Amino acid sequence: MHSRENNRKFKISKEIQRKIALILQQKINDPRIGISTVSGVDLSSDFSHAKIFVTFLNKNTKQQIKSGLFILNKASFFIRKILNKTMRLRIIPKLTFIYDYSLIKGRNIDDLFNNNIVKISKKSI
C-alpha cells in the first residue's frame, strides 16, 4: 500500500512542479523574481502543504534571494488559484517557497575539486 501512495505522491509532486514552473514563466511578471527555476517539490503526506524549492538566475545576493522568496510567497494564493483550475485535486496544497541552495553548494564543491586537480597537476610537473 505504501508503494502506491508514494507513487501517487511522487506523480502529484512532479505535476505541481511542472505547473508552477509554467505559472512562473507565463503569469508572474515581477522583475524582482526574474528568471526562476522550480527545482523540486516536497509534498506533505496528506497533500495539504508543499515546499516549493526554487532558484533564481542572476539573483545571487541574500537580499535578492530574500526579495524573490517574499514575492513568491505573497503570490502563493494566486498560484494556488491557477493550480486549482488546472489540476484535478480535492485539496490544493498550501505553497511555501524555499530557496534551493544545492546548486550553489554543488558549484562550491566543483570549484574545490577543480582547484585540487590544478594543485596536483602543478606538483607532478
From Swiss-Prot:
So which residues are the signal peptide here?
A: none
Predominant subcellular localization, coarse grouping: cytoplasm
Q: Name one GO molecular function term.
A: ribosomal small subunit binding
Q: Which UniProt keywords apply?
A: Cytoplasm, Ribosome biogenesis
Q: Where in the cell is it found?
A: Cytoplasm
PROSITE patterns to which the protein is assigned, alphabetical: RBFA
One annotated Gene Ontology cellular component of this protein: cytosol
Reading the lineage from the top rank, the first entry is Bacteria
InterPro entries of this UniProt entry? KH_dom-like_a/b, RbfA, RbfA_dom_sf, Ribosome-bd_factorA_CS
Could you give a single Gene Ontology term from the biological process aspect?
maturation of SSU-rRNA
Q: What does the record give as the function of this protein?
A: One of several proteins that assist in the late maturation steps of the functional core of the 30S ribosomal subunit. Associates with free 30S ribosomal subunits (but not with 30S subunits that are part of 70S ribosomes or polysomes). Required for efficient processing of 16S rRNA. May interact with the 5'-terminal helix region of 16S rRNA.
Quaternary organization: Monomer. Binds 30S ribosomal subunits, but not 50S ribosomal subunits or 70S ribosomes.
User: What NCBIfam families does UniProt report for this protein, alphabetically?
Assistant: rbfA
Family per record: Belongs to the RbfA family.
Xref: PANTHER family: RIBOSOME-BINDING FACTOR A, CHLOROPLASTIC-RELATED
What's the name of the protein? Ribosome-binding factor A
Q: Which organism is it from?
A: Wigglesworthia glossinidia brevipalpis
